[in-house]
């Protein structure tokens, strides 16, 4: 039986190994010399292949991590997400969120500085923390109810989507949908990673997995756009057109086909630098803001960062009795 058929895989550093063929067979067939740790150890599978979800230092830590993971999950796929008593004020404001996002839209920040403070007791249980770091996934609680978190990470590759990030996010989204766990998406995405490596390895096919997973999911889906939401990557990250139930945005959110500078350089390539700067400012005022999108029904509410926790809980309450079903099929045709 393949371990990849299980929902989550835990490995212990320097003790756990898995591979299709061991080092001896690899050397015999390909003449490549490689140790079992490099070939299929915990670090390899948690950071390079993405096969394992958790890498632990010892067996005791592994067992504790398994217990922690199970606390977020229902007993089976017919039950709702677990609801536990919440001693954290649902109206709690987080003033620090007002200054987390830099004024310069090209400056990075850690999306976990937004995720963690808004969750119950500021606790976030991250899944696959060492693989495809440009996307963050994991579990938390809001108002006592388990939620699945999917977020772009501006601190790693500017938060772009690539092949590995697409696979990581899509698999997690589908797991949450299987076990009735609501999805919270924190979006700050400038686009898909460009280049021949991505194109030749099928970024179109892999990128389609995220949009398929979101569109297929019937659990409550709440999205918060923290800063950038550009082009096709915006559509992919649980947007209104793909079936998101509630879409929120911060005042500095930029929802557009592309950034102002990129758009102006294409549309006004013959203009002088001075003229371009003036046009960029006009473009940003007209299009690179959440209010234009809100007028078109793509954003439900523009919120202040300090109110994020309550607004997310409020949105989940609105969707709690959501009843949506897909057309009767044995299964969908996921783009694999």
Residue ranges and their predicted role:
Residues 1-336:
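Ligand-binding clefts of soluble mixed alpha/beta catalytic domains
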């Amino acid at each position: 039986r393949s371990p990849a058929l299980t929902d989550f895989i835990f490995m212990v550093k320097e003790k756990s190994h898995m591979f299709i063929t061991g080092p001896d067979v690899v050397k015999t067939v390909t003449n490549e010399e490689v140790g079992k740790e490099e070939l299929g150890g915990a670090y390899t599978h948690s950071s390079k292949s993405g096969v394992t979800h958790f890498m632990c230092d010892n067996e005791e830590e592994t067992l504790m991590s398994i217990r922690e993971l199970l606390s977020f999950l229902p007993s089976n796929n017919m039950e709702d997400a677990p609801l536990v008593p919440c001693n954290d004020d649902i109206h709690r404001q987080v003033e620090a969120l007002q200054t987390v996002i830099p004024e310069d839209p090209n400056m990075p920040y850690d999306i976990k500085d937004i995720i963690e403070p808004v969750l119950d007791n500021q606790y976030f249980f991250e899944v696959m923390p060492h693989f495809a770091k440009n996307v963050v996934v994991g579990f938390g609680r809001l108002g006592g109810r388990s939620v699945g978190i999917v977020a772009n990470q501006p601190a790693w590759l500017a938060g772009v989507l690539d092949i590995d990030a697409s696979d990581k996010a899509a698999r997690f989204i589908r797991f949450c949908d299987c076990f009735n766990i609501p999805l919270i998406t924190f979006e700050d995405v400038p686009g898909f990673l460009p280049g021949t490596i991505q194109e030749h390895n099928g970024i179109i096919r892999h990128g389609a997995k995220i949009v398929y997973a979101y569109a297929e999911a019937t659990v409550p889906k709440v999205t918060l756009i923290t800063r950038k939401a550009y082009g096709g990557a915006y559509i992919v990250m649980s947007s209104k057109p793909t079936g998101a139930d509630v879409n929120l945005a911060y005042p500095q959110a930029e929802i557009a086909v592309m950034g102002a500078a990129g758009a102006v350089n294409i549309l006004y390539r013959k203009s002088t630098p001075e003229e371009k700067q003036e046009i960029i400012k006009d473009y940003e005022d007209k299009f690179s803001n959440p209010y234009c999108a809100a007028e078109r029904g793509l954003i439900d509410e523009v919120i202040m960062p300090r109110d994020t926790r309550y607004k997310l809980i409020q949105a989940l309450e609105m969707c709690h009795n959501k009843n949506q079903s897909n057309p009767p099929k044995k299964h969908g045709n996921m783009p694999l």
